[in-house]
């Protein structure tokens, strides 16, 4: 179907048929598929270009369909843009509008619906029209025209009026007249007509004719004036004058809205008041104006207000008859009368008040205020309410039969009596859901609950009364009252000198106490001449005094009063440092003087007036040194413990330096925790002074006495418990540590730990033996231990002391040596050469056990042969022990030669004992009776109670190393002893 381009009235339906020669194969395919695409929804259609190619949006799979309905990059949709911004080319702020989000078709559709101002809705009205006309006339004058003369305005600007003007004209308004209410004019006209009718009826015919003529003239005049007013009326809206509100009613309320007759009466009363007011003002005048009178007439309603036009214009002008009427009293005169005088007239006209009355007014005196009355109100607490209301006791009621209910009532009553009424309110709220509490709401058991509540309240009040009496008495108790109660003798006053010196001492002590917390200003007025630090330089002394004033005095500080312009900044800073040092020196000097004065006066007489000494002998106690009262600052060097350095993996900075003895921080520390190093040094010195050939028995006796003199020190240390199973099953390799330092003291805590370790080993053996007997196992008894095996100990304080008591007697080394063999004595001497023997009780225990076993084996021939060489072994052991004391003394002195020899000796001994480490075995020939077991348990308990004094923790590392070496030596001796037994 063809159509012409010029014909706009034709409507085309369908797709036009194109010529085949004008279209390519691809284009024909697109046209053929167009019909199929229309059948698909919009989101399933593929976007293709003009030649039928599918549009590609990106280099990935979803690039063929992008955007809403495939509109990205097309003319119908938005085109993405790259954001570019640099220093030279800044990104522009684009203002967006509704057209930025619309397609071309939408913009075309909205083109005719644009909102624009039109002349039809011109708010200026005729002003805009006149302005347009003037502008057109100006343009016409400037440009030449083919038509001579002015062009009509209708040809230049179309004559249009606004919608407001059209509405006013439809409502009856005419152009050029003001917009006002015409009701006033109609009301005025109606009133004039009413007056004319009234005059016509009252007058004669001649008068009526004249009146008619006059009325016609007046009508003409009124018409002329009306037309004139209409022509020259103002275009402004009238301003309505608001009448002030002078009544007591609400805004907009009209009480006479439905009662017009009352409103008319009120208006007449108001006019009468106004007339009386005007008559009073014009009193004494012969001619009174008639302006207050209004002419009667028809058509005046009750709701209409009087105006100027209501005046009687036909009156004579003067009211002479008003003079004949009595002038009523004014309102001000009536108000001057007393209100009470009006009552004398009575209610009724025939009633008269009597001149004298027999009635007498009876007056009552106010109540008398009691002497103990308190005008301040005190709110009662729940307890006080209970106290006041508990006077009336409820009657006794038997308890309910239900035991659970009785217990519940008694518990609730006790709780309410103790805590207050709010607990009862809580139970009442609970009774709404729980029927068990119905006794609170007049239920079963209510009277029993009231009785129990009263009893508990009385009991609680009786308990509280003694406490209150006691608290009141304790508040008033003073030192004097307490002395009188206890029967103490009153204090005797001391002499006048002591009493006079007491305030001075108190003042000095107060000043010394305040000196630690407050800074006292220095006053240079009372300083002597020799205490002024810069007396040789008066200018500098003046600056120093000014410096002290600025430092210790407040207030405003002026600028530099003393000119110091010649000094540089460095000199000022140096001078200020000098001033600070001088001020500190003066302050210290004053404090020292106060302390010296306090020490001279003493504090012995301060408490003489407050306490009475029990005996006269106590008065001779010397006064204490008061300087020791005040703490002093002390500086000492802190050094970490070696074990601490080892745990933190750092090198001990004080390695090789002697450790100083720590000062006890209190007297209790010095008594209880006595340092062990001092006792050891004393023992070493005493042993070095003594001759070398001193017998071992004598040394043991002296040291046993020394140990007996210090029982408190031994019992004061606390032993650290050692795990039993760890002592049994622990490996010796766990305790291997480096060699101890020669110059470090030994820690007795570690010594006690090692002793506990050995004792726990013995306890473990006994425990396993008893356990085997209970289980019925054949436990082989231990072989008697040869007397040459000793457990190594770490405490070197008692090197040669063996103070173990047995049956009340002291056992010495001489008695033990009688049962030893020569070979065993040599091994004992060799083993004890390097082992410190501080653990005296442990050694004594082992010697006692060895002696007991040796007595049983004296019958053996081998043991008898060994007794022959006991004397030689005694001498060798004594020499070796003396040699050991000398070597230990050299070790403590810290010589380098001794250190090297000790290390060599220990390494040699370690090599010699390494081959004797064998597995532990039990001897089948040991005695295992119950009596020996009980004795051994008793000795172990006694050893467990032993306490060693605690010393400094810096000896920890040395003791750990020493402990490991002692354990190794004891294990070596034990293994060597058992290997000999098996060989036999």
From Swiss-Prot:
Residues 814-859 form a coiled coil. SURP motif repeats lie at residues 408-450. SMART domains: SWAP. Residues 679-695 have a biased composition (Polar residues). Residues 131-153, 464-503, 679-717, 775-803, 824-984 are annotated as: Disordered. It comes from the Eukaryota. Its main location: nucleus. Keywords: Coiled coil, Growth regulation, mRNA processing, Nucleus, RNA-binding, RNA-mediated gene silencing. Residues 131-144, 473-495, 843-858, 947-974 have a biased composition (Basic and acidic residues). Residues 882-892, 905-922, 934-946, 975-984 have a biased composition (Basic residues). One of its GO terms (cellular component) is nucleus. InterPro entries: DUF1604, G_patch_dom, Surp, SWAP/Surp_sf. Residues 697-709 have a biased composition (Low complexity). Residues 160-202 form the G-patch domain. SUPFAM superfamilies: Surp module (SWAP domain). GO terms for biological process: miRNA processing; mRNA processing; phloem or xylem histogenesis; siRNA processing. GO terms for molecular function: pre-miRNA binding; primary miRNA binding. It is found in: Nucleus. PANTHER family: G PATCH DOMAIN-CONTAINING PROTEIN 1. Functions as a component of microRNA (miRNA) and small interfering RNA (siRNA) biogenesis. May assist Dicer-like (DCL) proteins to efficiently process and/or recruit the precursors of miRNAs and siRNAs. This is G patch domain-containing protein TGH homolog. It comes from Oryza sativa subsp. indica.
